[in-house]
A protein has these predicted regions:
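Short helix-loop-beta junction
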Residues: 1-10
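Detector for C-terminal structural segments
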Residues: 1-2, 22-145
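Short beta-strand-to-loop elements that line the ligand-binding cleft
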Residues: 11-18
Length: 145
């Protein structure tokens, strides 16, 4: 909040339970459960370009179909998405996705905020912890004394 204020962006937080937030994420900004919010900050894992970009920028992913929470739409983006989805060769698909990414950065429909919530401290009773190199931690290696 303080960092954004330095950029002349004044925000107020409406802190809600995480699952409620996720439910609204699918319902969209027009739903009463959004409480009049003009933005949302939802944690998610982006595992591939389609999961990371397409569901937030395609007019075909408006709620309740998917997670285009703010109903962002741009015909150019839809064209790049269609090109990527129908390209079965790596180079044309990657080129369309790279252009989509560049346009997302240029148009800036989002502010990308990351807060690493990965565990970094454990009780001494927990053994076999392998610190993650990404957002996910493998609990299969762990045990308790």
């Amino acid at each position: 909040q303080q960092s954004l204020k330095q950029c002349h962006i004044d925000i107020q937080f409406d802190v809600i339970e995480w699952n409620t937030l996720f439910t609204n994420w699918r319902k969209g900004s027009k739903d009463p459960s959004a409480n009049g919010a003009q933005a949302t900050n939802v944690s998610f894992a982006a595992m591939d370009p389609f999961f990371a970009m397409v569901r937030f920028t395609s007019t075909k992913t408006f709620p309740p179909v998917s997670n285009n929470w703010g109903y962002f739409g741009n015909p150019e983006f839809d064209g790049l998405i269609a090109s990527a989805r129908t390209s079965f060769e790596d180079k044309p698909r990657d080129a369309a996705l790279a252009k989509l990414h560049a346009r997302i950065v240029e148009e800036a429909p989002f502010i990308w905020i990351a807060h690493d919530v990965g565990p970094r401290a454990m009780s001494q009773k927990v053994k076999g912890v392998v610190q993650p190199r990404s957002w996910f931690i493998d609990i299969a290696t762990m045990s308790m004394d």
